[in-house]
Amino acid sequence: MAAKDVKFGNDARVKMLRGVNVLADAVKVTLGPKGRNVVLDKSFGAPTITKDGVSVAREIELEDKFENMGAQMVKEVASKANDAAGDGTTTATVLAQSIITEGLKAVAAGMNPMDLKRGIDKAVAAAVEELKALSVPCSDSKAIAQVGTISANSDETVGKLIAEAMDKVGKEGVITVEDGTGLQDELDVVEGMQFDRGYLSPYFINKPETGAVELESPFILLADKKISNIREMLPVLEAVAKAGKPLLIIAEDVEGEALATLVVNTMRGIVKVAAVKAPGFGDRRKAMLQDIATLTGGTVISEEIGMELEKATLEDLGQAKRVVINKDTTTIIDGVGEEAAIQGRVAQIRQQIEEATSDYDREKLQERVAKLAGGVAVIKVGAATEVEMKEKKARVEDALHATRAAVEEGVVAGGGVALIRVASKIADLKGQNEDQNVGIKVALRAMEAPLRQIVLNCGEEPSVVANTVKGGDGNYGYNAATEEYGNMIDMGILDPTKVTRSALQYAASVAGLMITTECMVTDLPKSDAPDLGAAGGMGGMGGMGGMM
């Protein structure tokens, strides 16, 4: 086992604080509408330019291992805030730095670290309750656009696009961000349910100009098996041909003579058919087939529940107003499924989201809800260069997370004002002893830090602005973009409550752990001294040369 380097008490805390400051100082220059950019070098390709706090934090590794431990712990604050609310990473870092700096000063002055932590936790718990009381629901498009604009660093077009997307697909709909092809940002909305499987044969195409298959009012056969024998399908095909409607087959696979016969029937015009593979794999495929069945009012033909394809009737088939299939995607528009059944299915998937443990599972389940409940919107980000595209895409994703958080828990006045108001409301909070009171004061002082940093990044004097804002009440604050005072809500400067709450809670959590740190252990650096064994042998040979 490698030897360890151990530091105790103040030595450990000073090193840790140095690491915290390096990371926090790099991150906090990005805060606010006049925050600066940070350029990140990449091992290949052009450097990345960003104003996203968590992107900056993730790049930082320090040479000194003790300092690096401090930096990594604050990086955790930014990552956690990002995971919880998708934004507020810089605010969380600024809060953490302030609590750690003031807290370690108090520890150095002889305060009890555990009581300090209890005081900080008490203040944060009270602040969270006050934040919830200040929160205003965010339901209309205007407020959503304002939140998106603020989070995208005052880019109004992004805010409007996100509001429009939410308007079209609903609050539950899936909104994805992709690279655009031009200079302008675009919004594409996919109505109905779309999944990423295309036609199994190009011979199904009936719209050569678009290279797509379009079926009007088709029957939809859903089978949880491979279909290779056409005999299994004859009863269904005959029934559909009599009804004079087209047929869409969604199965695990359609191959061999079954596919060949379907193609021949389609080309001869006997019955209009198209076949696609079912989306997903394994259990997820079964679940998605069931989703499609619910949406279209059909039944999944599955041998697991004793159903056979030969015995399927028209009653087992789903129906939709229209289906469009191209080489990569299938879109089912206006399924005839009952609204109550669809809502029941959505509620069931929501329950699974609550219980999901992995982010991947949660994301896939949310996509399924969206496909059943609303639709899918795609924001295509336009930019002149790849570097700008990366930076802008990151901003749009941030803004999207922020607007979702705003819809979830409401909004408070932005620009650091909400935390100032909360701090003034809990200013009389008292702990059980003097050390806890100091902890409460540390947390209250930290709540001013985001406003001060926003003002500092504007090139103004933080203390003057902070005192002026404290002197006002309600939503009165400082608009850093225009450098004027006024009602933040009226000026459209809003922060999602969830973002502010998460930033404060995660900052206090990690800061509390760091204040109560008494010892740090790391591996000793390996010495790079050369191995002298080989050199010694060579010396001996030289001696032998002298004897000859």
Swiss-Prot record:
ATP binds at residues 30-33, 51, 87-91, 415, 479-481, 495. GO terms for biological process: chaperone cofactor-dependent protein refolding; protein refolding; response to heat. This is Chaperonin GroEL. It is found in: Cytoplasm. It is an enzyme of class 5 (isomerase). Forms a cylinder of 14 subunits composed of two heptameric rings stacked back-to-back. Interacts with the co-chaperonin GroES. InterPro entries: Chaperonin_Cpn60_CS (IPR018370), Cpn60/GroEL (IPR001844), Cpn60/GroEL/TCP-1 (IPR002423), GroEL-like_apical_dom_sf (IPR027409), GROEL-like_equatorial_sf (IPR027413), TCP-1-like_intermed_sf (IPR027410). Its main location: cytoplasm. Its EC number is 5.6.1.7. GO terms for molecular function: ATP binding; ATP-dependent protein folding chaperone; isomerase activity; unfolded protein binding. The keyword tRNA-binding does not apply. It catalyses: ATP + H2O + a folded polypeptide = ADP + phosphate + an unfolded polypeptide. The keyword Transit peptide does not apply. Keywords: ATP-binding, Chaperone, Cytoplasm, Isomerase, Nucleotide-binding. Together with its co-chaperonin GroES, plays an essential role in assisting protein folding. The GroEL-GroES system forms a nano-cage that allows encapsulation of the non-native substrate proteins and provides a physical environment optimized to promote and accelerate protein folding. Coiled coil: none annotated. GO terms for cellular component: GroEL-GroES complex. Belongs to the chaperonin (HSP60) family. SUPFAM superfamilies: GroEL apical domain-like, GroEL equatorial domain-like, GroEL-intermediate domain like. UMPylation of the chaperone by YdiU negatively regulates its activity, facilitating Salmonella survival under ATP-limited conditions. It comes from the Bacteria. UMPylated on a tyrosine residue by YdiU under ATP-limited conditions.
